[in-house]
């Protein structure tokens, strides 16, 4: 992968034609993403949204034995504090760049922060996260990193997140994995092959259910999910194959392992729902190096499915129309599970979409061809779409589910739930039916005043989305 020689990886927009604004059906989006050059959409009015800095902060906080130095003013530290309060993570410092520093530079503050990080925590690795201000004052982070790496004898790794190169937050994950591949993950020629499959899941991925399934099926794995370790990342170079829980977040690592080290990555859908989990486990079991017999894998799947099916009889959706608002891989998996429960997928609201999602979009175009909205952090577009579609149930994350509830729609927030594996089936189904059968909160919230005037809500959902003109 020639990108490793470069200072930065290409953005998702350049590599895969990623879109962060779209309104249409599944077939139309698939057609657009299959074009040689995707026509980008821009918003004439944009409310909020995560950027690459936030994505990088989340992933860096999940690397065990590390300290992250956020080279920025206090604002980026506030984002990190929010992430830590929500999910915990590794230690971090902020250099507190001030007004003069943004013009004259803050190299001294950066070096002092590295010294303090090493004295305080004796970490295995130190990351220096550059932020938009550093893109302005042009601090020489590389020189500081090289100097301190020689001084302390541990990797000091720069991660360059300018905040405005890409409109997709997942590019922040690409930046972190690119930095690890460039500076840390070097293959040991004497290392023995690892008879296992790399289990890859990044920031925010809950894994207890799917790990229980892998153990029950007798599948050997190198755990690169949840809280990552440098040792496991290095071992990944010797595995026989890689499989992701969520390919959106980990795609750069998957592709780099395959292109640079010949470790094939299994293009399987997320292990959500009965069929999705079964397909995923069978793919992992078929990969070279998977321990345990085919009979053991099949026996475990049949037993776990039978237990889940019994529980699902009490949690049918009975034709309810559902609006799913999640990142792409999760959204497709949950949508399939909704159909397993007897629900109807009215619309998919995604954070982004790119050429890697074309196959799934084609599948849905052949099913119910639901509407697709790409609208991360755009409450106006979300409320407008919900008001026009009037679904029976909304499935999304907590901060966005509030908007659906205020619109009078039963809402289920799934970010606190482990949706993966057969255990995820038994955890997710009751959450959905409980929200659908107990709409009192939504009725109460909808009785209040709207955050948007009627004139705004009368506009089309894509009123502020325009095609880029070249």
Where are these regions (language model features)?
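An N-terminal assembly and electron-transfer interface module characteristic of large anaerobic redox
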Residues: 1-470
